[in-house]
């Protein structure tokens, strides 16, 4: 709703203004806690998504102690008016700003009138009896409730990264995998096995896949890995960028007694994924 209001306003003034999204870097929670905040959409992913819907600029405000200490009026005057020259602003109904989040949407509208900025307030989107929020989506992903997370997002949760060299264990088991290097600040869903679709730059159609996320306890893995086995497709993916849309959560991460048991389970995972993704024909 927030982005739709921005795009509608830009079209109404015949694009005399540039539709933009303003965000903070680092995330305020990371700044105050001193810990990296896992993100649903890291910056490169966010930029790509915004570009796809027509947003022309992504403005990253360095979140510093000086910025955090600005009063609501100082924030509007110094940042929105003097630096960004904003003419139209859209925010959610629960938006807060300024030192210790003292400013609310009513304050923003009042300040907008003072400085000649049109302020639009987007109503909170709800599902069931709860509002849709990033915290609720994060919780669903960490609990393995992928269907709920995707419903709240309005799209499948996606992982974007570059294919890197792995241990090639999957190839030895007969199920070659593309090892995906994810951004350090990307939020990992609950470890386990997923079914989904892979978007590859070189192809126009998505490829069905089984995705394993976790520490690989059967082989005493030390670091979490994202391993993608493409169904009904083979080729060299090293160095290529992939987007993996997670559509189904199959099972939790499991430590098996040996590689034979692991191999049998992977075969079952592939069969289950084929049914869930409505694929025709046998999986190679």
Curated annotation (Swiss-Prot):
Its EC number is 2.7.1.26, 2.7.7.2. Signal peptide: none annotated. GO terms for molecular function: ATP binding; FMN adenylyltransferase activity; riboflavin kinase activity. Pathway: Cofactor biosynthesis; FAD biosynthesis; FAD from FMN: step 1/1; Cofactor biosynthesis; FMN biosynthesis; FMN from riboflavin (ATP route): step 1/1. The keyword Kinase applies. Pfam families: FAD_syn (PF06574), Flavokinase (PF01687). It catalyses: riboflavin + ATP = FMN + ADP + H(+); FMN + ATP + H(+) = FAD + diphosphate. It is an enzyme of class 2 (transferase). Belongs to the RibF family. NCBIfam families: PRK05627.1-3, ribF. This is Bifunctional riboflavin kinase/FMN adenylyltransferase. The gene is ribF.
